Amino acid sequence: MTQKKNKPTQKKKGLHPRNPHSQRYDFNALILSCPDLTPFVAENQFGDLSVDFSDPAAVKMLNKALLHHFYNVENWDIPPGYLCPPIPGRADYIHHIADLLAKSNEGVIPQGKHINGLDIGMGANCVYPIIGHRAYGWRFVGSDVDALSIKSAKFIVESNRSLAGGIKCRLQKKSDNIFTGIINANDIFDFTMCNPPFHASLEEATAGSERKVRNLSANAHKKGSNKKAELFAKSNTNKPVLNFGGQKAELWCPGGEDAFIQRMITESSDKPENCFWYSTLVSKKENLPALYKALKQVNAVDVRTIDMAQGQKVTRIVAWTFLSKGQQTQWREERWSA
């Protein structure tokens, strides 16, 4: 492909200032890092280099290129039909966690292999642990209820020297449990993180994907791409959930996001001293009052809400701790002053 000069960089709205993906994608640089991306890159109707974000193969190859270019992860893949997350948004959560730790550490981000994170629902992609380990040197445990996700994540870790010794994978054997069976009695985590299932049923997940397809079709019409709009419309009748990727555990659970996080809060209260900051993404703003009430009921000492935005999408992190001020000081002196 003939190299095309990128247009002047433009910051993506709302991303964290340390997020390396805050500029427009430099496809020429990405292709140099990952030549396999080449056939997926073409000029769009505005004369910019881009990929077709409705094509799962293109999105997966873009992720592979981003992980190689920015995080020195050369070997990355996921099984067909598994969630292929947008890297910029995933990186944002990591950088906001770093800020959260810094606020508990006199403004200094704790870095290095003595800092331990736990990713609940790591998925086959292993993206949160990859970014956290490469950006800050943190060690991770990633858990999942799906055996193939664990197998895929292990393969990614074992296939990249840059991840050696940085990430462990644990299978959650009971799908009703979150921390139980994953956090052992002697485990110490400086933080946990989670992108919980959003929907309450397969029907709700399917409807959400159909809505996404309709929005893509409407945007394509608006931009004058009738051919692409027709393709989106056709895909709406062909298992839309699969068009965007994601297995059952990644997309939905009984009771949806609220029920999942309520369980997480309850289980975290059984392990108050195993972790400094428990955290989760909360996509639905209307779930916040019930979650705050649950955190009050389990006597969380401190609760923080961190707003995040990427373009039109707005979400937030809710983080909580059970450690007293004295325990927090002791934790900081023993673990973060190294």
Curated annotation (Swiss-Prot):
Disulfide bonds: none annotated. The keyword Cytoplasm applies. Its EC number is 2.1.1.181. The gene is rlmF. One of its GO terms (molecular function) is 23S rRNA (adenine(1618)-N(6))-methyltransferase activity. Pfam families: Methyltransf_10 (PF05971). Belongs to the methyltransferase superfamily. METTL16/RlmF family. GO terms for biological process: rRNA base methylation. HAMAP family: 23SrRNA_methyltr_F (MF_01848). NCBIfam families: PRK11727.1. It comes from the Bacteria. It is found in: Cytoplasm. Keywords: Cytoplasm, Methyltransferase, rRNA processing, S-adenosyl-L-methionine, Transferase. Coiled coil: none annotated. Specifically methylates the adenine in position 1618 of 23S rRNA. This is Ribosomal RNA large subunit methyltransferase F. It catalyses: adenosine(1618) in 23S rRNA + S-adenosyl-L-methionine = N(6)-methyladenosine(1618) in 23S rRNA + S-adenosyl-L-homocysteine + H(+). Gene3D superfamilies: Vaccinia Virus protein VP39 (3.40.50.150). GO terms for cellular component: cytoplasm. Residues 1-21 are annotated as: Disordered. The keyword Transmembrane helix does not apply. Transmembrane segments: none annotated.
